[in-house]
Swiss-Prot record:
Any one annotated GO CC term: fungal-type vacuole membrane
Highest taxon, organism lineage: Eukaryota
Name of the gene: AVT5
Main location: membrane
InterPro entries: AA_transpt_TM
Compartment(s) where it occurs, according to its Swiss-Prot or TrEMBL record: Vacuole membrane
Residue ranges of the TM segments: 8-28, 33-53, 82-102, 131-151, 161-181, 206-226, 240-260, 278-298, 364-384, 386-406, 434-454
Name of this protein: Vacuolar amino acid transporter 5
Organism: Saccharomyces cerevisiae (strain ATCC 204508 / S288c) (Baker's yeast)
Lineage summary: Eukaryota, Fungi, Dikarya, Ascomycota, Saccharomycotina
UniProt keywords, alphabetically: Amino-acid transport, Membrane, Transmembrane, Transmembrane helix, Transport, Vacuole
Family, similarity comment: Belongs to the amino acid/polyamine transporter 2 family.
Disordered as annotated region, ranges: 335-354
Length: 459
């Protein structure tokens, strides 16, 4: 495998396999094992179709420019650029909130395992409860660690977070396999191989379906990967999403399948909270804690840029000026929202805009993102609920709806107004695009309706 292809695979894999893997076993709960595996497979295929469509439509961007969702909107309708910015803002904001929830889940357990392991007399004291309050640690970490990083204009210091993420997820996989093999010490519930029935089905499968969708979402970085390739032919580039999705699929089988079989119906939204305190578990919790602390700024920066773009769009709309270009917008084209190795590229692009725009406005947006993230994180304890909402909105838009829309509008457009026969392969991709677009709309509407009316808890 060529090095640039390998690099692209690792970029997509890291983007997809973030801290959301902690909720993967919980996603199996309303499905049962076999239907869960089938759903995981189907969502993987749909996500792969979206990535393959992106490799097909990248050629419609002029060769002198880098491919991006923003550039493609200029070929269809510049006004829909706000849809892409909204999807990015929702996804990045939601992922940031989920990171803070993970902080609230893990830090009290880390503190308890280190300082209160052998102190049973503290279990009922007021001091004990105060030092194990999740809100305390969310507050401390967002004030002293996350906020300073989010207000930085350079993310170069976070370039090693990608390696930390890969190592953390690999360690988590090993930890889950170990406890699956040695599960006699754990409180295991009923494992359903088919869909749970009766009282055992606490909530609808539609409420956790978006977690499967969210798990494969790496589409916002696909164009950046394509732009880095020397050979941009479909025959070569298609290997990148295929390898990445297949690797992610097997990783999710390990984490999701074995995690569900370990705890059964007792599984919760964050599997790490179920393991007993031990050195190996504490190391895993510390690794995931470090991951989410370093990754939060990588979500805040693109969220901030998207919010700024939306504000500019609204201002232009009120003035009756919908530009045919995005010269006044903060670019997201080359920003990898989860890979710190891409962050310097975005920073270089963002510098001129930061000089022209008021830093005060940028700081206000950053402060609002941090404040609302904090308020939601201390109010919501369900990691699964946040990931389900993000998956049903931002992930479906980025993975299915936008690639489907662009594919249907652009693929085969070169044959419009000509007498040439449209090749069968072009027709297949065009109608695949339409199907993916319809599927994305259906998932969004059905899942959001289920979440709103049926609810999603972490238990």
């Amino acid at each position: 495998m060529p090095s640039n292809v390998r690099s692209g695979v690792l970029t997509l894999l890291h983007t997809a396999c973030g801290a959301g893997v902690l909720a993967m076993p919980f996603a199996f709960k309303p499905f049962g094992l076999m239907p869960g595996l089938i759903t995981l497979t189907f969502c993987g295929i749909c996500s792969l179709c979206g990535l393959l469509l992106q490799t097909r439509i990248a050629k419609y961007v002029p060769k002198s420019e880098n491919a991006s969702f923003a550039k493609l909107t200029q070929l269809i309708n510049p006004s829909i650029s706000v849809v892409f910015d909204f999807a990015i803002a929702v996804k990045c904001f939601g992922v940031g909130v989920s990171y803070l929830i993970i902080v609230g889940d893990l830090v009290p357990q880390i503190v308890q395992s280190i300082f209160y392991r052998n102190d049973d007399n503290m279990s009922g004291s007021q001091e004990h409860h105060m030092f194990l309050d999740r809100r305390l640690y969310i507050t401390l970490i967002i004030v002293f660690v996350i906020s300073p990083l989010c207000f930085k204009r350079s993310l170069n210091s976070l370039r090693y977070a990608s390696m930390i993420a890969i190592v953390s997820v690999a360690y988590l996989s090993g930890l889950i396999i170990y406890h699956f093999v040695n599960r006699h010490q754990l409180e295991r519930g009923q494992v359903y191989f088919m869909v749970p029935h009766g009282d055992s089905q606490s909530h609808s499968p539609l409420t956790t379906l978006p977690i499967f969708v969210f798990a494969y979402t790496c589409h916002h970085n696909m164009f950046s990967v394509i732009n880095e390739q020397v050979d941009k032919s479909f025959k070569v580039i298609r290997r990148i999403p295929i390898f990445a999705i297949v690797l992610a699929y097997f990783l999710y089988i390990i984490i999701g399948g074995t995690g569900y079989m370990t705890f059964g119906e007792n599984i919760v939204g964050n599997i790490l909270t179920l393991y007993p305190n031990s050195i190996s578990t504490t190391i895993g919790r510390l690794a995931m804690l470090l991951l989410v602390m370093l990754a939060f700024p990588l979500q805040c920066h693109p969220c901030r840029s998207s919010v700024k773009n939306i504000i500019i769009f609204i201002e232009n709309f009120r003035k009756g000026k919908l530009y045919d270009n995005r010269a006044s917008f903060i670019p997201l084209d080359n920003f990898n929202s989860e890979d710190p190795q891409e962050a310097p590229t975005q920073q270089n692009n963002e510098e001129p805009n930061l000089r022209s725009e008021s830093l005060r406005h940028i700081n206000i947006i950053t402060l609002c993102i941090l404040l609302f993230s904090y308020l939601l994180a201390i109010s919501i304890t369900s990691l699964a609920k946040v990931l389900a909402i993000v998956g049903a909105t931002g992930s479906t838009s980025i993975s299915f709806i936008l690639p489907g829309l662009f594919g249907y509008k652009l693929i085969g457009s070169e044959f419009t107004g000509t007498n040439e026969r449209v090749p069968t392969s072009i027709k297949i991709f065009k109608y695949l695009s339409l199907s993916l677009f319809i599927w994305g709309i259906a998932v969004m509407v059905a899942s959001l309706s289920a979440i709103v009316f049926l609810g999603t808890s972490s238990h």
